[in-house]
Amino acid sequence: VHYIRSRMGEEPASENETKALIRIIQEYDGRGLLTFAQSGREIIYYHCQQGVGSLPKSYRLARHMQKSSSYHLEREQMTESAREKFKGMGTPEQYYIQTKKQPAFRIKVPAQSGNGRGVEEDKKAVYEEIHLLPLEYIFSLDN
């Protein structure tokens, strides 16, 4: 048990959550990946590091989602030094776009502030802002 715990996070797919996510991505075909995170109001679109084949499609879909929301659009940027530092490591979006060659996006929603009733109101406001984004994505695939 000590060996397993000391190695977690040091090798690709060493955490159970990561293994499960990789298995899902490998087993099921999809038309894209949307992930959600807290911190800002952004839609980040990812591109293949080896080529630009899916970049125009990713940009077009991201632009469509941006028009449906009040979120800022960002292209995933990775400097050369960061690529070397994190070689072999990556985000679910990077893994998905590299293996499936389909668009991937991270949607950053505002972080919750305060305690009590304010938190519930914040959650409801964020939900109102983003609840249609997955549907907008699906409907824009064939356009």
Feature locations, PLM:
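Active-site/substrate-binding loop(s) of hydrolase catalytic cores
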Residues: 1-56, 63
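Sec-exported extracytoplasmic/periplasmic mature domains
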Residues: 26-29, 70, 135, 139
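Active-site-adjacent mobile loop/cap segments within catalytic or ligand-binding domains
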Residues: 33, 42-55, 86-143
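Short catalytic/ligand-gating loop segments at beta-alpha or beta-beta junctions
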Residues: 37-38, 73-93
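Acidic, glycine-rich loop-and-strand cores that form catalytic or ligand-binding grooves
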Residues: 51-52, 56-77
